Amino acid sequence: MLYYLSLGSNLGEREKTLQQALTAIGQQAGNILRCSDFFYSQPWGFDSPNEFCNLCCAVDSHLLPLDMLACTQSIERQLGRTEKSENGHYADRPIDIDLIRVFDGNGEELSIVNSQLSIPHPLWQQRDFVRIPLEQIFQS
């Protein structure tokens, strides 16, 4: 499977945390094929003085989508992530890893919507911090 992931951090040493996340993804999830440059953005969906550092990557993996989700959530916890939100609202975080798009071995894009996962990510085209880094990967 080919996964397109979005990673972001707005707490601590953001770039270092993203590099650690990429290392963990490469060790635990699959082969990283391409990565975008860092993309800096203001928080989306909440107010914070902490700017985000984001990137996207393409990962070739044998993991099924729910297994990839579990793997990326485990990596988030390893890097200090606790809750996905505070009282149902977005909040500052040391790391966030989202599954954005997934393609099977035949190059067909998967569509999954259930209580755990929505692929393609329903908001990816509305978020410059995802859309622009993804475009960079697609152009390379």
Task: List each model region and its residues.
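A SAM-dependent methyltransferase catalytic signature shared across enzymes that methylate proteins
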Residues: 31-32, 101
